[in-house]
Amino acid sequence: MSRVCQVTGKRPAVGNNRSHAKNATKRRFLPNLQTHRFWVESEKRFVKLRLTAKGMRIIDKKGIDVVLSEMRARGENV
């Protein structure tokens, strides 16, 4: 399972660890992914999404129906 948010599309970013001596070693910044079940009243079913904390805030703001319709318009299988 890839580490990609289904709502925002955020994925791991690459950067550097920096020691006190300013040595650089490669590292990955992983998104804050959570698996969450949402009740979709219009479809009378639960939808399980893998999304970031920011994606949950977007659903709180817009509503699950709007977000699902945007995801389906992008071609995401939900």
Swiss-Prot record:
A Pfam family per the record: Ribosomal_L28
A Gene Ontology molecular function term of the record: structural constituent of ribosome
Keyword RNA-binding applies: no
Keyword set, alphabetical order: Ribonucleoprotein, Ribosomal protein
Residue segments, region Disordered: 1-25
The organism's place on the tree of life at top rank: Bacteria
Signal sequence extent: none
Gene Ontology cellular-component annotations: cytosolic large ribosomal subunit
Example GO biological process: translation
NCBIfam families to which the protein is assigned, alphabetical: L28
Family: Belongs to the bacterial ribosomal protein bL28 family.
UniProt name for this protein: Large ribosomal subunit protein bL28
Species, as recorded: Aliivibrio salmonicida (strain LFI1238) (Vibrio salmonicida (strain LFI1238))
